[in-house]
């Protein structure tokens, strides 16, 4: 869930917002229903005024559909840590790496052919540290135990967004290399 919204944002911001024209398809049912309401309202007003109804312009169509999804989330790809304890006083650190993988493909609307297909991965890093004390005091009759720690986890949403943006960029490069589109160079002034 949410991958479509991140893909739309990546497409709309690629090349400063000039590389892709994105047509709404995720909420197409809502869009079509709203257009029917507008059309019906215009027909009623025009009929009451004895005029022809004002037409609603055509929807934007796509020559290419870009779709895909999150195809993998692998946990504990790499884990580790270290620690030491002396006379009941210790310190430790740990880390873990997960990987999210996304796949995006460009499909020709005219032929149904998959023109381009790319995958991108992003590592998600988690790490933490802790310190502790475990000691008997007062002639070994009282136990003192203290632990403290902190952990940091990279945002999974950020990782998915980064992987999608990398996949869109790779899609642009592959499409350019295969002649599906050209990238207009900005003029130096």
Give each language-model segment a name.
Residues 1-76, 99-117:
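N-terminal segment of the mature soluble domain
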Residues 37-47, 77-97, 131-148:
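Mixed-charge, low-complexity intrinsically disordered segments
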Residues 57, 88-90, 179:
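Glycine-centered flexibility motif
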Residues 94-189:
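C-terminal/domain-edge helix-coil "capping" segments
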């Amino acid at each position: 869930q949410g991958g479509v919204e991140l893909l739309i944002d990546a497409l709309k911001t690629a090349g400063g917002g000039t590389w892709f024209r994105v047509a709404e398809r995720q909420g197409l049912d809502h869009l079509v229903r709203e257009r029917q309401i507008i059309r019906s309202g215009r027909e009623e007003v025009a009929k009451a005024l004895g005029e022809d109804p004002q037409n609603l312009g055509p929807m934007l169509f796509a020559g290419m559909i870009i779709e895909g999804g999150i195809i993998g989330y692998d946990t504990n790809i790499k884990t580790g840590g270290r620690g030491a304890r002396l006379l009941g006083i210790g310190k430790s650190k740990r880390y873990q790496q997960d990987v999210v993988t996304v796949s995006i493909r460009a499909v020709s609307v005219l032929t149904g052919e998959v023109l381009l297909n790319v995958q991108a991965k992003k590592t998600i890093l988690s790490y933490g540290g802790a310190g502790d004390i475990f000691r008997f005091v007062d002639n070994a009759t009282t136990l003192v135990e203290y632990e403290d720690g902190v952990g940091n986890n990279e945002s999974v949403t950020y990782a998915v967004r980064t992987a999608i943006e990398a996949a869109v960029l790779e899609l642009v490069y592959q499409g350019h290399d295969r002649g599906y589109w050209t990238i207009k160079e900005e003029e130096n002034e």
